[in-house]
Structure formats: C-alpha cells, structure tokens
C-alpha cells in the first residue's frame, strides 16, 4: 500500500518535506486527487511487472509498492477509464525500469548492450505486435504497453505518440554519450534535452486517451493549451532536478540543471539550488495564469454543436489533469523509495534494480 498513507481519499496524511524542498503553494493550492481505481491499479501493475519479468520477484515483493509508481499516475490521470489508466500505469512502471537499465548500462559501461536495446525499442515502437515475445523482457514489456495504448486511440494519435517516443529514445542515447564521456551540457542544451528525457510530450499525449478524445491539431497546438501543458511538465522536470541535485553531484552525474548552472554559469551549489527553485516557483505562478487562459479557451470551443461540446469537455479534463500533475509529482518525490537514497546500503546502487548485465544477453 501507499497512496496518501493507506488512504483512498484526497486528504492525505502529511509526509515530512525537507524545508529546502518545501513548496507551500503546492501543499495549499494544489490539493491531491486519487483515481478510485488505484487499489486495483497497484495490484495489477505489480502482477504485470512479475509476469513480464521486468523486476525479479523478490524485488517486486519488497520494493514495488514503496516505489509508488502507480500512485504517481493515479494522482495525475483523473477521470481516465480504468483500462486506460492501467495501460498508462504499466507503461510508466516500464519507463522507470527502462531508466534504471539505461543507468546501469552507463555505470557498468555497456555501450553495445545499450545500442542493441535502443534499436530494438525503435523497432518495437513501430511494430509492437511483432515484439510481444522478444527475448529481452524490457522489449517485450514495452511492446505489450504499446499494443494496449495504441488500441485506445486512432492511427493519427498513435503516429504522433510514436514520433514523440522515437525522440525520447534518441535523447536517452545523447544522455548515454554525455554521461560516459563526462560531457556537461550547457544550460540551454540541457533544457532542450530534458524536455525529451523527461518525456514532456509523452505524458501530455496521454492526457487525450484519459479524456477519451484525440484533440484536433489546432486545439492541441493552441498557445493557451500548449503553454499550460509545457509549464506542468517543466515544473515536474525541474523539481526532480532540485530533489536529485545533491545525490547526482555525489555520484559524478552530468545531467542536472544545477550541474549545468555550476559548470557553465559559474554558480555555487547554493546559488544553483536557489536558481532551480526560482524556476520551479515561476512554473507554478505561470501555470496559474496559463490554466485560466486554457479554461477560457475550452469554454470558447463549446460552439453549440455536439462536437464542440465534446472537445471543450476534453480540453477541460486535460487542463484539470495538468494541474493534478503538480501535486502528484511533488508528493511522489517525498513518498517514493526511489528518492530515499539515505536509506540505501550503497548510495550508488538502488536496492530495487537488477545490477546484473541484463543487456549483455
């Protein structure tokens, strides 16, 4: 269990947040939400991780619930049909496992293994049904996720999602090269790369099956909608950097906004933390303005036709869930075992990962 300290209401038991990471405006103005399907979601994602052999059974038993992967998604995609949320949650859990494999391939310097995985994921993204029984569980699990996600939406959405995720895979490859070669990107390079490695447009795309409607291009690309979507994702990425900075500096990392600020802008660690926090807080205030404009835009779409009413309702649902991302991400960073580095026996090796050379098979 987890999700709001064993509660399925939107009134969580407070988790202690370090003062340096505390954002009172999130705690006060962004109340947490939780999809009512969450208890089953957690159980079924745990089973899926086992069935797809994405984590060893002992690690699923000991760590899966405490990692709070399903809590994160169940606090975001409110209103999604149960089967859509289940597919998103399984895909999200897969994404974290993939991120861990990528990290281990870097730590153990396995470029050949990473290259094979990269090409296989590109292939599975374009033809998932052909990869459902692939020998690498990470490829097969990804294919399973994609078959399910693609089933909810029309071909145009599927093609857009695939295009966005091909770019994410290539961004992970750039991060692999940067980390193995010790290259610290400039601030602007990092910000552009982070939008891809954090998969900004993937999580934004998934708002649409949650709302049960593909948004027309003109709606999705409208400045009011796009700005609200971008700010919600930027907040998540930069807050993650703020929470991760001390451990990533200790681990000789090169991919963190703070590290780029220190290296290329000459900031001290304290100044870098202050600057990331400023950017995080600017995202919050910017979103509050963007949210208002996006909801006004939604209202303007209700033109008296059935189609207009449907699109307006879907945009409102998407914008409401952009708001939910703030609280879900914020509390995830203080509840998930993924960030409790001080409790690990070895700070360089997360206890929930398979540290073997999985990719060398």
Report the location of each language-model feature.
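Alpha-helical, largely C-terminal catalytic domains
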Residues: 1-361
């Amino acid at each position: 269990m987890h999700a709001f300290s064993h509660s399925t209401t939107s009134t969580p038991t407070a988790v202690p947040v370090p003062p340096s990471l505390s954002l009172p405006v999130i705690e006060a103005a962004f109340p947490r939400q939780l999809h009512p399907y969450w208890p089953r979601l957690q159980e079924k994602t745990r089973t899926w991780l086992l069935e797809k052999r994405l984590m060893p059974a002992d690690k699923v038993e000991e760590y899966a619930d405490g990692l709070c992967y399903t809590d994160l998604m169940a606090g975001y995609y409110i209103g999604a049909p149960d089967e859509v949320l289940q597919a998103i949650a399984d895909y999200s859990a897969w994404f974290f496992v993939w991120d861990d494999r990528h990290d281990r391939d870097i730590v153990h310097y396995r470029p050949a293994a990473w290259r094979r995985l990269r090409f296989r994921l590109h292939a599975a993204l374009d033809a998932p049904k052909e990869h459902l029984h692939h020998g690498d569980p990470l490829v097969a699990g990804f294919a399973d996720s994609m078959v399910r996600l693609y089933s909810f939406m029309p071909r145009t959405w599927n093609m857009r999602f695939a295009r966005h995720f091909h770019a994410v895979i290539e961004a992970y490859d750039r991060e692999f090269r940067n980390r193995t070669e010790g290259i610290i990107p400039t601030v602007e390079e990092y910000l552009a790369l982070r939008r891809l490695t954090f998969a900004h447009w993937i999580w934004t795309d998934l708002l649409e099956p949650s709302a049960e409607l593909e948004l027309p291009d003109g709606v999705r690309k409208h400045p009011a909608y796009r700005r609200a979507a971008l700010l919600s994702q930027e907040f998540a990425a930069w807050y993650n950097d703020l929470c991760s900075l001390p451990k990533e500096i200790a681990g000789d990392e090169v991919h963190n906004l703070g590290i780029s600020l220190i290296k290329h802008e000459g900031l001290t660690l304290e100044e870098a933390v202050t600057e990331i926090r400023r950017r995080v807080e600017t995202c919050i205030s910017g979103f509050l303005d963007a949210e208002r404009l996006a909801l006004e835009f939604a209202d303007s779409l209700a033109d008296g036709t059935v189609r207009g009413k449907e699109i307006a309702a879907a945009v409102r649902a998407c914008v409401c869930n952009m708001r939910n991302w703030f609280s879900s991400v914020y509390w995830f960073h203080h509840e998930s075992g993924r960030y409790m580095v001080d409790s690990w026996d070895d700070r360089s090796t997360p206890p929930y990962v398979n540290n073997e050379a999985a990719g060398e098979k």
